[in-house]
Swiss-Prot record:
Species this protein is from: Photobacterium leiognathi
SUPFAM superfamilies: alpha/beta-Hydrolases
Alphabetized UniProt keyword annotations: Acyltransferase, Luminescence, Transferase
Pfam family, one: Acyl_transf_2
Name listed for the protein in its UniProt record: Acyl transferase
Membrane spanning residue stretches: none
Gene name, Swiss-Prot/TrEMBL: luxD
Active site positions, chain numbering: 116 (charge relay system), 213 (charge relay system), 243 (charge relay system)
Entry function: Acyl transferase is part of the fatty acid reductase system required for aldehyde biosynthesis; it produces fatty acids for the luminescent reaction.
């Protein structure tokens, strides 16, 4: 039986000391008759907040999943820090902190969904800790190449002190010296570094690519998957989509449907897509989006006091 109950997510705060924290939102399963094996963590892409994934969380919850979202440190959103101090390693630390927090609450079976830049972080995390499955959407595999396409220039070829500090990426100041230094110091930059991290990955893994993605090369994603020593991998294409999965409602709905179908299957260690899912209606999605916006604004006002 479908449960169309809508509400705001449960708000949590992970305190880290030094007056820093990570904000986490929890969405409980909307359909209690379906029992899933895993809690799903959603890692949003660069310059995206957790509330940008309200629709996906609702789709997953409508199909029986317990869903966790968070805002990274030094990023946009409700967690501590400014985005001009963001680095891939900070993003990785944030994700690992959320997963450890879940384990501290007795939640050990965890699947991860990551998009865009966060997918590159997810590849590192999946190689280092026990996850049940990994799903990526328009996931970055060659960070240097993606940055060059997005910024229209390969700034990583420059001496660190010559790189402009105010590079605009997705409408935000990247804080280029911090970001680039971390890329080189911790081997985030190349396709080879991603391949080396994931070659021994042996969990169900589904990668969604977009046929109109100008930032991520489909052949590089296929090369990454082809180098994995696993028979639990699959690539699906989101037809008609670019790197921006929210560019229109048709693309967005296809993204929600496809990822939900994938999550249901990999939750049972299968890498095909299930045919039927329970979709929330448009009114429910509108209500949850408005509720999350109100919650975000309420928390943001408290944070500036």
């Amino acid at each position: 039986m479908k449960n169309t109950q809508t509400s705001a997510p449960i708000d949590h705060m992970i305190s880290l000391g030094d007056n820093r924290h990570i904000r986490v939102w929890e969405t409980l399963p909307k359909n209690q008759e379906i029992k899933r094996n895993n809690t799903i963590v959603i890692a949003a892409g660069f310059a995206r907040r957790m509330d940008h994934f309200a629709g996906l969380a609702e789709y997953l919850a409508n199909n029986g999943f317990h869903v966790i979202r968070y805002d990274s440190l030094n990023h946009v959103g409700l967690s501590s820090g400014e985005i001009n101090q963001f680095s891939m390693s900070v993003g990785k630390h944030s994700l690992l902190t959320v997963i450890e927090w879940l384990k501290g609450r007795g939640i050990d079976q965890i699947g991860l969904i990551a998009s865009s830049l966060s997918a590159r972080i997810a590849y590192d995390v999946a190689a280092e800790i026990n996850l049940s499955f990994l799903i990526t959407a328009v996931g970055v595999v060659n960070l240097r190449s993606t940055l060059e396409k997005a910024l229209k220039y390969d700034y990583l070829q420059m001496e660190i002190n010559d790189i402009p500090e105010d590079l605009d990426f997705e409408g935000y100041n990247l804080g280029s010296k911090v970001f680039v230094t971390d890329c080189f110091d911790n081997n985030w930059d190349s396709l080879d570094s991603t391949i080396n991290k994931t070659k021994d990955l042996d969990i169900p893994f589904i990668a969604f690519i977009s046929n109109g993605d100008d930032w991520v090369c489909q052949q590089e994603v296929k090369k990454l998957v082809g180098n994995m020593n696993s028979d639990k991998t699959k690539i699906y294409s989101l037809i008609g989509s670019s790197h921006d999965l929210g560019e229109n409602l048709i693309v967005l709905r296809n993204f929600y449907q496809s990822v939900t179908r994938a999550a249901i299957r990999v939750d049972s260690e299968v890498i095909d897509l299930v045919d039927d899912i329970s979709e929330p209606n448009f009114e429910d999605l509108t209500i949850i989006t408005v509720n999350e916006r109100r919650l975000k604004n309420k928390i943001a006002k408290r944070n500036v006091r």
